[in-house]
Amino acid sequence: MSDSPTSSPPAPSADSAPPPDTSSDGSAAPPPTDSAPPPSPPADSSPPPALPSLPPAVFSPPPTVSSPPPPPLDSSPPPPPDLTPPPSSPPPPDAPPPIPIVFPPPIDSPPPESTNSPPPPEVFEPPPPPADEDESPPAPPPPEQLPPPASSPQGGPKKPKKHHPGPATSPPAPSAPATSPPAPPNAPPRNSSHALPPKSTAAGGPLTSPSRGVPSSGNSVPPPANSGGGYQGKTMAGFAIAGFAVIALMAVVFLVRRKKKRNIDAYSDSQYLPPSNFSIKSDGFLYGQNPTKGYSGPGGYNSQQQSNSGNSFGSQRGGGGYTRSGSAPDSAVMGSGQTHFTYEELTDITEGFSKHNILGEGGFGCVYKGKLNDGKLVAVKQLKVGSGQGDREFKAEVEIISRVHHRHLVSLVGYCIADSERLLIYEYVPNQTLEHHLHGKGRPVLEWARRVRIAIGSAKGLAYLHEDCHPKIIHRDIKSANILLDDEFEAQVADFGLAKLNDSTQTHVSTRVMGTFGYLAPEYAQSGKLTDRSDVFSFGVVLLELITGRKPVDQYQPLGEESLVEWARPLLHKAIETGDFSELVDRRLEKHYVENEVFRMIETAAACVRHSGPKRPRMVQVVRALDSEGDMGDISNGNKVGQSSAYDSGQYNNDTMKFRKMAFGFDDSSDSGMYSGDYSVQDSRKGSNGASSEFTRNETENRNFNNRRY
């Protein structure tokens, strides 16, 4: 053995030495390698002879990584064959114990051939010997590590035993040069551990890891742990990928179902969708919002004093067929729940459209009372086939009302399209209409406090349509018959079948007359030009009804007093100038009213019924005037009483007749309005008792009115 070391020094010059040496030892390597002192190394070297070619290539980088120890690197590879290169390398640090140290290096030599991880430790061990000399005491632990490696390789216990007799001096060696012993202890575990990992072929990995942390012998232990954890890591990665795939599949299924559900709930026909330029601004009177917030429209009003009229208009009540949930959408398509009904469903809801369920009848058709499966009461409006209102008004209601949600506007629940049938389903308002309570036969006198509340509520609903909807919505048929009341006499403006979207780029909308005579603004009767100020005029007529208790047109009044506006105009001027309104106020009230409120309503009505449209106030100003306790603001728009152009009743009548012919092509008018409760066309035709009679056809009133004027 000593001769082989002497001949080995020349070998370090080139890495070619290992192959020849392995060939020389090949006689003992296949089986006899166990007899040689470094039996375990040859055993390890025999399997990887094909690998040495790769390790050198991979092994070359480490030298570059650690420039100081490259020479030892070259010396370390040759040792595997002859075991002598180590003796030459250890002498520099410690000359006396070179021979005993020779045997430990052989143990280090096999690792480089198997996985090339041990060579780095040897490379870095030469530099630390001085520091390691002080660490001579810790030498004993290495021997303790030797038994575990022997136990770790199941087939290698015999090899260590044969190896120990040869290098019997190895125990003393660790005591003297601490540098060499640490390497041998590290090497055996590597040999034992590398016997398993070679299958994983992690040659590149161990090389880099020991090169970075070679000084500590503990670095050799992690590689085996990593080799064992590699399988676990792959298993965990597989589970993670599978779990991710399952979650992704579930998400796709959920999205597909959600999309299908949306498609089912969507409108079946795009023509019923609101225009793209239609938007709604929320205000303090919407569902679930704070009623004390100021009005959000231009020239907004403050509603903090709503309670002065006897009730808070910001309160939310859910009785009487109303759904005022705080979660109701601000500008959603008919809120939540079912929106599309089949004709069969509506037939069941209305009990086959039974006559005893009829709430009223107008020019468009009948209104039936119905009950949904959840017990909610609804009003089903059925359009007459071929009626003048027809599909245009139906589409308008579906497009507009479905987007409008305000506590003073009747909400649309759903709709039905079946062949030629067109039906709308509204929330049911149980307490009839303002017309019913003001002019109904045998009805008790409507209290003044309730009249004020109704005026303010309906004004807020109209102001919302004019100010907070863009483009603004013009009702076009404001009248007492279209103001519904709930059990607490909260006003709900209804009948949007006549509403039109008024584009902000247009100053008016020309269309056929559908409003009720007596509420028509002068400019509307003259030319058919429609603006939001036309609604203001009609609302002024409603205020006059509340003040006086009279109908807008009453053929049983004395000659020249049939028209409410014509009769009230001089009295309004007198009341504003003198403060005496005794001739205007409904005598049935018997002076049970608040004078300030009466005077404020008179001023507001006078401003609303001005002959000149531009000189009328906006609805937002009307609300502020009616709902203010002190200063009512400039409701006059800078105009004093009498400054507006004079109201010519004769010209108004001529304009009305002319426009009626232009709109309908004949001197007749159709039924108008939505009626409920005790009122029907048959009852109205009986009307012969002045204020106690109910009129629903304006044809008779206007024909008689015009005949008496001319």
UniProtKB/Swiss-Prot annotation:
The lineage of its organism: Eukaryota, Viridiplantae, Streptophyta, Embryophyta, Tracheophyta. This is Proline-rich receptor-like protein kinase PERK13. SUPFAM superfamilies: Protein kinase-like (PK-like) (SSF56112). Mostly expressed in roots, especially in root hairs. It comes from the Eukaryota. Negatively regulates root hair elongation. It catalyses: L-seryl-[protein] + ATP = O-phospho-L-seryl-[protein] + ADP + H(+); L-threonyl-[protein] + ATP = O-phospho-L-threonyl-[protein] + ADP + H(+). The gene is PERK13. It is found in: Cell membrane.
